[in-house]
C-alpha cells in the first residue's frame, strides 16, 4: 500500500454512491426548519447519503456549529461560539419524534467558553428526547468538557443509553491531531463515566491513516479496555480540506477486518471497523449489541 502523502490517490473502496431521494431532501428540510445542525453536514461525513436517504438516521449537533477547538482532522468551524439556545433541546426532541427514530445520537461542538462545557444543555436534551420519545434509545457523544468531573456527572445523571467519547487517534499522535485535548484525559473521562453509571455502555472511536502503527492501534485498544470501554469503532481518516492533516495511508478493507477481529478478542462487546466507518455509523445496531451483552452477563 502506497503511503506517499503527496501522491496518495483515494482507492476504489472509498468511492461513495450519492443518493438524494425524498428521505434525504425531507430530512434536510426538517433540520433547516427547526434551526438544527447535524455533524453529518458540518463534519462532511462520507456516510450522509446512506444515513439520510436509506437508513433515515442523523446525528444531531447541539450547542451551535462553531467549536472552540481547532483539531487538525475536523471540518467543523472554529471560532467564538454563539450564545446558548435553551430552546434547542425541545427542537431536537420534536425532530426525533417527527422522524420516528428508534435510536438517536446527540453530539456537540466543544464549548470551552462555558464553565460547564455545555453539560446542562446536553443533559436537558437527553431529558427532552426521553419525555417526547420514551422508547427511543439515546447515545451522547460529548467533548471531554474540560475534564471536569462535575460536568460529566451532570450529563450522566440524565441517563443516556450510551456514552460515547472518542480518543480519535493513538497516544503518540494525539498532540499533533488534537492539540487542545489529551489522550489521558479522554481515557479518564471514559473511566469516570463508567464509574458514575456502571450499567451504561461506553464507546470510543479511532481514526487510522494518520501515520500510526498497527502496534499503536492495538495499544489504544488495550488502553480503552483497561478503562472499561465496551464498544469500539475504527474508520479511515479522510482529509476534509487542504488545510487539514494529510492522509498518510489508506487501509485496505482486509486490514479493517483484521482490526475488528483483534478488538473483539480484546473483549469489546461490539466493533465496527471499515473504510467509511464513523463514530455514529450503524449506531442503532451497536446499542442492540450492547444490550444483548448486558443480558448475557446478568
From Swiss-Prot:
- Which prosthetic group or cofactor does it need? [4Fe-4S] cluster
Q: What is its EC number?
A: 2.8.1.8
Q: Annotated Gene Ontology MF terms?
A: 4 iron, 4 sulfur cluster binding; lipoate synthase activity; metal ion binding
* Subcellular location, principal: cytoplasm
| Bound cofactor: record note | Binds 2 [4Fe-4S] clusters per subunit. One cluster is coordinated with 3 cysteines and an exchangeable S-adenosyl-L-methionine.
Q: In which pathway does it act?
A: Protein modification; protein lipoylation via endogenous pathway; protein N(6)-(lipoyl)lysine from octanoyl-[acyl-carrier-protein]
The UniProt entry, under PROSITE patterns, shows: RADICAL_SAM
Catalysed transformations (reactions): [[Fe-S] cluster scaffold protein carrying a second [4Fe-4S](2+) cluster] + N(6)-octanoyl-L-lysyl-[protein] + 2 oxidized [2Fe-2S]-[ferredoxin] + 2 S-adenosyl-L-methionine + 4 H(+) = [[Fe-S] cluster scaffold protein] + N(6)-[(R)-dihydrolipoyl]-L-lysyl-[protein] + 4 Fe(3+) + 2 hydrogen sulfide + 2 5'-deoxyadenosine + 2 L-methionine + 2 reduced [2Fe-2S]-[ferredoxin]
Q: Which UniProt keywords apply?
A: 4Fe-4S, Cytoplasm, Iron, Iron-sulfur, Metal-binding, S-adenosyl-L-methionine, Transferase
Protein's UniProt keywords contain Iron = yes
InterPro entries registered for this protein in UniProt: Aldolase_TIM, Elp3/MiaA/NifB-like_rSAM, LIAS_N, Lipoyl_synth, rSAM
Q: Name one GO cellular component term.
A: cytoplasm
Q: Where is the Radical SAM core domain?
A: 53-269
Compartments in which it is found? Cytoplasm
Q: State where [4Fe-4S] cluster 1 binds.
A: 40, 45, 51, 280
Source taxon at top rank: Bacteria
Which amino acid positions bind [4Fe-4S] cluster 2, per UniProt? Answer: 67, 71, 74
What family is this protein classified in?
Belongs to the radical SAM superfamily. Lipoyl synthase family.
Q: What is this protein called?
A: Lipoyl synthase
Q: Which species expresses this protein natively?
A: Geobacillus sp. (strain WCH70)
